Amino acid sequence: MLGALRSINKEKPSIIVGFGGYPAIPALMAGGIRKIPRIIHEQNGILGRVNRLFAKKVEIVACGTWPTELPKNAKAKYVGNPVRNKVLKFSNSPYIPPGNWPLSLLVIGGSQGSSIVSRTTAEAMSLLPEFLRNNLRVACQVREEDIMEIEKIFMDSGVSAEIEYFFEDVPRRMSQAQLVVSRSGASSIADISIIGRPSILIPFAAAAGDHQTANSKGLVESGAANMITENELTPLVLADYITKVLSSDKLASKMAKAAVSRSKPNALAEFADMIEVISKNGS
């Protein structure tokens, strides 16, 4: 705290911006003492502990996901989560709806993959209708220790699959996919929305405050995604959802459009503008 006050006295900032986490506390507290305008950015649909502590004290909460659960009387605006240029390159990519031609399913489970997501997806393949098994091509992110097991399950199902621990070109693959199966991290939600793809979301049950379920809410309520909790997740349930989307070009196209409607491709600029305005005006 004293260090933060010394830094403020030296640097004389016109605004202080926090992104959550305990290291932000001293600067935000010191800014309050010095009556410097403060903003916090929350990437998830539920505020983290530090952002929750300051939500009613700062000028505004910049929300990366919408809706976001907020304390009463907290001022907030949906600005979105900034994404990489590699994602923006495929913003609102033309969507090829499912039909009687090769179809692409992208399965991603966060930065290090997810055993339950990849395994359940692999086991769901044998439960799909024959026309889907014949047409489907799957790109599945898998934890390194699970690769051999998942490869065998896909092979036994007869569905063509590319199995990798990490895909360097997820945005490109997502732009080519008819459907995405994904965890509900804030970055994944932003990518799916900006590129504009139908999705089946499987929130990570152990996420702090169950924030991944909250992250899913906007896409689900807009009709862009289906959500399956880990407690509900089985190969049969997942196969039914995959079949539902990939058997209807109208439904899939509607979901893709709904995803784009939730996107914030200009999130970085919106956030920067917010900072500049509050920095100049003080509120």
Language-model regions, residue ranges each:
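A short, well-ordered alpha-helix in the C-terminal region of glycosyltransferases
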Residues: 251-265
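Acidic donor-binding loop of glycosyltransferase active sites
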Residues: 13-15, 175-190, 197-198
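An amphipathic, basic-hydrophobic alpha-helix
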Residues: 1-15
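Active-site-proximal region of nucleotide-activated glycan assembly enzymes
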Residues: 32-92
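Short alpha-helical segment that forms part of, or immediately flanks, the ligand-binding pocket
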Residues: 29, 171, 189-197, 217
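Structural loop-to-beta junction motif characteristic of Rossmann-like glycosyltransferase folds
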Residues: 36-37, 178-179, 196-204, 224
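C-terminal alpha-helical cap of glycosyltransferases
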Residues: 264-283
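Donor-nucleotide binding loops and adjacent catalytic segments primarily
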Residues: 92-179, 213-217, 221, 228-238
